[in-house]
């Protein structure tokens, strides 16, 4: 079992146990405040930035020192004996500070790796850029795919138990329970989606940390099954079962979950062509084997979610599709398998015969209807795809308006450079171009036709610059040589901004 440690333990042997006293340090709240100011624009900043001050931090720490019991009921009013009249503000500050504290063990782990004091081999981690070579090279060899949505909400206590692998300080875990009490109804087994939405907006940093911890625990078990399934029949399954139910406090015995013939069931998991790919909360399972094998995986996933994470999952919502007949949506692309049939005549001595040759090719398309829906959501067009003016940008200068539209258009072409057919992107370019013109024409309160006639045909020439021409201007020699030697798709891996369709809702 020593060779399985990289998959199962996730290197949880940190000795930085005393995290709870940091909640009484002023600099923690300063860090949290700075991180809130520098937060990515993909996350809505609804924090306390405009109200935070060092005086409020000192007052909060003083009140926490004076308290004998740091417990607040979720049903209390905004006024309580700890926070006084500023419960929402103080609770927000503590939760932001706690989000910084629980990330410290991971930061120390990263710093030690960068300094070379210890070199860690992460078996379960891959970059998002590895997905594109996977689609290009490996996907044509597979036959079946299943879309898997990682289920949530999850039982609150399971979240705390998962963090016990990383955070050894019991006081910090009790503080986490305090915040979960504050945001959710502790008496329910399933967190309502509306509470998840409130919590993710009020404290996105802590929400992402808890969610990523949940996904990491789930994938550590799933990838163990994937990578070591061929060794299960050769080793004792006791450690495997003990790892899945890591506390021994769950009511269901192992024998009830996996029947007595579990080694026979695990025997069918042996498959070297099983692939697992995930981005955010959506993942895919793809295999070269039969649908029976895919149903086996669906069976294990449902048992894992229901008996280990106490999350109800409906097996009927996990569809197993044949790649040559169905397409699936992932990372903003619609991907499917094309089979090109050809007949080859072969002659051997005096005998000649015909052979059917089937060539598989992955087809990645731009979801034009979903892109139009995304543009409609951002008020660039209506539901039918008719361009409208961006009224919120009308107060900006002409240069800023044009630069914003051109940047959006080029980013979309840049992201979908790996698409098999780019004709649908020209409709998106048309929508953005006319939306830009209508936004500019909104300023002098003239019509679009008058505005175009006044400025001439050279208006917005940036929109007509092809993505290939832009790349050839940046890399003149390298790009031209690459195009001559390779006529297929070119995946641009220097993606710094993911479009809205990629983010799983």
Curated annotation (Swiss-Prot):
Keywords: Chloroplast, mRNA processing, Plastid, RNA-binding, tRNA processing
A GO cellular-component term linked to this record: chloroplast
Key word Chloroplast present: yes
Example of a GO biological process term: tRNA processing
UniProt keyword Metal-binding present: no
Pfam hit, one: Intron_maturas2
Subcellular location: Plastid, Chloroplast
InterPro entries with a match to the protein in the record: Domain_X (IPR024937), Maturase_MatK (IPR002866), Maturase_MatK_N (IPR024942)
Stretches assigned to coiled coil: none
GO molecular function: RNA binding
Signal peptide (UniProt feature, chain positions): none
Function as written in the Swiss-Prot or TrEMBL entry: Usually encoded in the trnK tRNA gene intron. Probably assists in splicing its own and other chloroplast group II introns.
PANTHER family assigned: MATURASE K
Family, per entry: Belongs to the intron maturase 2 family. MatK subfamily.
HAMAP family: MatK (MF_01390)
This protein's name: Maturase K
Species, as recorded: Morus alba (White mulberry)
Gene: matK
């Amino acid at each position: 079992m020593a060779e399985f440690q990289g998959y199962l333990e996730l290197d949880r042997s940190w000795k930085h146990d005393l995290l709870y006293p940091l909640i009484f340090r002023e600099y923690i709240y300063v860090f949290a405040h700075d991180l809130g100011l520098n937060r990515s624009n993909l996350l809505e900043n609804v924090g306390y930035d405009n109200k935070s001050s060092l005086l409020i931090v000192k007052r909060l720490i003083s009140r926490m020192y004076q308290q004998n019991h740091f417990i607040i009921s979720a049903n209390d009013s905004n006024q309580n004996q700890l926070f006084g009249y500023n419960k929402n503000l103080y609770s927000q500050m503590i939760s932001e500070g706690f989000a910084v504290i629980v990330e410290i063990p991971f930061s120390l782990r990263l710093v030690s790796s960068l300094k070379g004091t210890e070199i860690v081999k992460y078996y379960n981690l891959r970059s998002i850029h590895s997905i594109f070579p996977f689609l290009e090279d490996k996907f044509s060899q597979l036959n079946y795919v299943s879309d898997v949505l990682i289920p949530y909400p999850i039982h609150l206590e399971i979240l705390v138990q998962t963090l016990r692998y990383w955070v050894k300080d019991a006081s910090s875990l009790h503080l986490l329970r305090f915040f979960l009490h504050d945001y959710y109804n502790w008496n329910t087994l399933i967190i309502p989606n509306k509470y998840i939405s409130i919590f993710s907006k009020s404290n996105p940093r802590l929400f992402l940390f808890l969610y990523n911890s949940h996904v990491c625990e789930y994938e550590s078990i799933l990838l163990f099954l994937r990578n070591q399934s061929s060794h299960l029949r050769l080793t004792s399954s006791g450690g495997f079962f003990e790892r899945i139910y890591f506390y021994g406090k769950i009511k269901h015995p192992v024998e009830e979950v996996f029947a007595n013939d579990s080694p026979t069931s695990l025997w069918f998991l042996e498959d070297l062509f099983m692939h697992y790919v995930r981005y955010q909360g959506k993942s895919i399972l793809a295999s070269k084997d039969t649908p029976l094998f895919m149903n086996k995986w669906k069976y294990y996933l449902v048992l894992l979610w229901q008996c280990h994470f106490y999350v109800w999952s409906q097996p009927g919502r996990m569809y197993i599709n044949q790649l040559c007949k169905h397409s699936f949506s992932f990372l903003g692309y619609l991907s499917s398998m094309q089979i090109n049939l050809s007949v080859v005549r072969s002659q051997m001595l005096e005998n000649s015969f015909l052979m059917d040759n089937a060539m598989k090719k992955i087809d990645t398309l731009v979801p034009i209807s979903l892109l139009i829906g995304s543009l409609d959501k951002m008020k660039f067009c209506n539901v039918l795809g008719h361009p409208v003016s961006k009224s919120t940008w009308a107060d900006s200068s002409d240069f800023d308006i044009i630069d914003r539209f051109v940047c959006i258009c080029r980013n979309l072409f840049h992201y979908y450079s790996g698409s098999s057919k780019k004709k649908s992107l020209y409709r998106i370019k048309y929508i953005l171009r006319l939306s830009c013109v209508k936004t500019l024409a909104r300023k002098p309160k003239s019509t679009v036709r008058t505005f175009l006639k006044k400025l001439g045909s050279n208006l917005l020439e940036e929109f007509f610059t092809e993505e290939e021409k832009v790349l050839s201007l940046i890399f003149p020699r390298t790009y031209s040589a690459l195009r001559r030697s390779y006529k297929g798709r070119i995946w641009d891996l220097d993606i710094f901004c993911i479009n809205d369709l990629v983010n799983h809702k």
